[in-house]
Regions:
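Conserved hydrolase catalytic core segment
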Residues: 1-31
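Structural signature of beta-strand start/N-cap positions in the alpha/beta core
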Residues: 16-19, 112-114, 137-140
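Conserved alpha/beta-hydrolase catalytic His-Asp/Glu region
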Residues: 29-36, 48-108
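Glycosyltransferase donor-binding loop in the core domain
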Residues: 45, 49, 81, 121-124, ...
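Hydrophobic "lid"/C-terminal helical patch
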Residues: 57, 93, 132, 159, ...
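Short beta-strand/loop motif that positions the catalytic acidic residue
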Residues: 109, 115-117, 121
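Short alpha-helix in the alpha/beta-hydrolase fold that links the catalytic acid
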Residues: 111, 125-134
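Catalytic active-site module of serine/aspartate enzymes centered on a nucleophile-bearing elbow/loop
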Residues: 138-170
Length: 170
């Protein structure tokens, strides 16, 4: 959700921003099917299904490599997500379901920009990151190996290296 917020900040306050990192995100609004799925998940949460929803989310947040080699990080992440209130989860899903597209602003971005994505990200596949990088003049793209939607946890060394290099560049 951070990428959606960052793109809207650039849209409204570009003169205040020195650099942009778009990480495992996309510029598209939800289509009707994705929006309906978010509202199904809201209903599930309201009917006591928070644990099921979050367990299902973990199945698509992490790469197959992480499932095979680092089950502990999945457990820690699930435990952390379970601490969120139902209302926070519902408001987050509503915000994502109703967000506007921001693809139309990408070509106008004139600040340094880096796009990062996990090689095995199911939620925001690398093709969506490639599209954004191609639209933002002068931007760079890094696809982080052996990671899904949470590369900062799954392959933190590669993630941090790209982050540090970008931040040192300006």
């Amino acid at each position: 959700m951070g990428g959606y917020i960052a793109l809207n900040l650039v849209k409204r306050y570009s003169e205040r921003i020195k650099g942009l990192i778009l990480y495992d995100t996309q510029c598209y609004a939800d289509n009707a099917q994705a929006r309906a799925k978010r509202y199904e998940n809201i209903a599930l949460i309201r009917n006591g299904g928070k644990q099921k929803y979050l367990e299902d989310m973990c199945k698509i947040l992490f790469s197959p490599v992480t499932f095979q080699q680092n089950g502990e990080i999945i457990k820690i992440t699930l435990d952390l997500m379970l601490k969120a209130t139902d209302e926070v989860l519902i408001q987050t899903l509503e915000a994502m379901a109703e967000r506007e597209e921001t693809c139309s602003i990408l070509s106008a971005i004139k600040i340094p920009a880096m796009v990062l994505c996990g090689e095995h990200d199911i939620l925001t596949p690398p093709e969506k990151s490639e599209y954004m990088q191609q639209q933002i003049p002068g931007s760079v793209l890094h696809v982080i190996a052996n990671s899904g939607h949470l590369a900062h946890l799954e392959n933190k060394d590669a993630f941090n290296q790209h982050l540090n290099n970008f931040l040192k560049s300006f």
